C-alpha cells in the first residue's frame, strides 16, 4: 500500500513575516559589506556604518587598513619641528606630506603626553602610564620593520614592547578574547581606535559621530573586519583623520553634527601635540 505524503500548507500570514525577516537580514548583510578603495600599495580605505549605536552625529566610521610590511607608521610630536604650538591634523598633513594622519593618545593640559612616546628611536616621553595597557609600535629596532598593537597585560608581548623605534602608549579597548577592557559608561564622544586583524594588518577606525566606548567596541567586534584586539587613542575633539593621495581626499574632525555639512579641511582647529603618520617607505 502506497501512502500519500500530505505536506502541511503554510498560510500566507506565516509566509509574509518570514519573507520580511529574510529580506531585512539580506539588506542588513548588504549594509555591513565594506567597499574597499586602494589608496596606495598596502593602504585601503572604506566606510563602516554604526547604526543604531551612534548617539550623536553621523554614524559613519572611517576605516583605514594598513599592511605594516608595505607602509611606514611614524610617531610625530610638535616639538620635533620647532613649532611654538601643537598643530591641527590638517597642518600636520601639510607639514609631513604623509598620505594619512590620525591623532595619537591622551595628553595633559600642558601638552605632555600621557604614557610612553618614541619617534625615530628617540624618547619623547619616558614615563609609562600605569593604567594604560595598549601600545602601538612600529619599525622594529633590529631592522624588521612592521607594526603591531601590543597588549601589555600579555607578558609574552610586553617584554618585546620596547624593541621598536616608534611607540605610542594608550589604553586597551578590547583584547584577543573579545573582552571589553574599559568600564561601561554612558559618556559619548567621537572615537579613534587602532586595531589588528587576523592577518596582522593595522586597522585605524575614526568615527564621524559620538559613541560610548562599549558600543563602539561592539560595532567593531561584530563587523566584517576580523579584528582580534584594539586600543583606543584620544577621543572627542581630538579624534581626527586626514587621508590625501592623488585625487582621493578624506577628512574628519570630531565632533560635528549630522545635520551640518561635512566640515571642510580648513575648519580643523583642535591642537594635536602628537599624531601618527602613514607614509610609503
Task: Name these PLM-found stretches.
Residues 111-130, 180-191, 196-229, 238-281:
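Conserved, well-ordered active-site substructure
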Residues 63, 135, 193:
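Short, surface-exposed charged micro-motifs
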Residues 78-81, 150-158, 206-210:
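Short, solvent-exposed aromatic-acidic interface loops
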Residues 11-129, 205:
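Zymogen propeptides
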Residues 108-185:
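Active-site-adjacent helix-turn-beta-strand microarchitecture at beta-sheet edges
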Residues 1-10:
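N-terminal Lys/Arg-rich, disordered targeting/topogenic segments
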Residues 59, 142-146, 197-203:
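Beta-strand-turn-beta hairpins that frame and shape the catalytic cleft
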Amino acid at each position: 500500500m502506497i501512502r500519500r505524503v500530505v505536506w502541511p500548507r503554510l498560510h500566507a500570514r506565516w509566509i509574509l513575516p518570514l519573507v520580511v525577516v529574510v529580506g531585512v537580514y539580506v539588506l542588513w548583510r548588504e549594509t555591513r559589506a565594506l567597499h574597499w578603495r586602494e589608496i596606495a600599495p598596502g593602504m585601503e580605505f572604506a566606510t563602516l556604518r554604526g547604526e543604531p549605536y551612534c548617539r550623536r552625529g553621523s554614524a559613519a566610521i572611517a576605516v583605514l587598513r594598513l599592511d605594516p610590511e608595505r607602509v611606514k607608521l611614524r610617531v610625530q610630536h610638535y616639538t620635533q619641528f620647532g613649532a611654538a604650538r601643537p598643530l591641527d591634523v590638517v597642518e600636520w598633513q601639510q607639514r609631513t606630506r604623509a598620505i594619512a594622519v590620525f591623532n595619537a593618545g591622551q595628553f595633559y593640559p600642558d601638552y605632555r603626553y600621557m604614557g610612553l612616546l618614541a619617534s625615530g628611536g628617540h624618547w619623547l616621553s619616558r614615563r609609562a602610564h600605569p593604567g594604560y595597557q595598549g601600545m602601538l609600535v612600529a619599525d622594529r629596532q633590529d631592522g624588521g620593520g612592521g607594526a603591531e598593537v601590543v597588549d601589555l597585560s600579555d607578558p609574552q608581548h610586553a617584554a618585546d614592547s620596547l624593541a621598536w623605534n616608534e611607540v605610542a602608549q594608550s589604553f586597551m579597548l578590547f583584547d584577543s578574547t573579545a573582552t571589553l577592557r574599559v568600564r561601561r559608561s554612558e559618556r559619548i564622544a567621537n572615537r579613534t581606535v587602532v586595531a589588528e586583524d587576523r592577518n596582522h594588518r593595522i586597522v585605524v577606525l575614526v568615527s564621524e559621530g559620538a559613541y560610548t566606548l562599549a558600543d563602539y567596541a561592539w560595532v567593531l567586534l561584530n563587523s566584517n573586519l576580523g579584528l582580534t584586539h584594539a586600543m583606543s587613542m584620544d577621543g572627542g575633539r581630538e579624534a581626527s583623520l586626514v587621508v590625501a593621495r592623488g585625487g582621493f581626499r578624506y577628512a574628519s574632525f570630531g565632533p560635528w553634527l549630522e545635520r551640518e555639512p561635512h566640515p571642510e579641511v580648513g575648519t580643523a582647529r583642535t591642537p594635536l601635540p602628537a599624531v601618527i603618520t602613514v607614509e610609503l617607505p
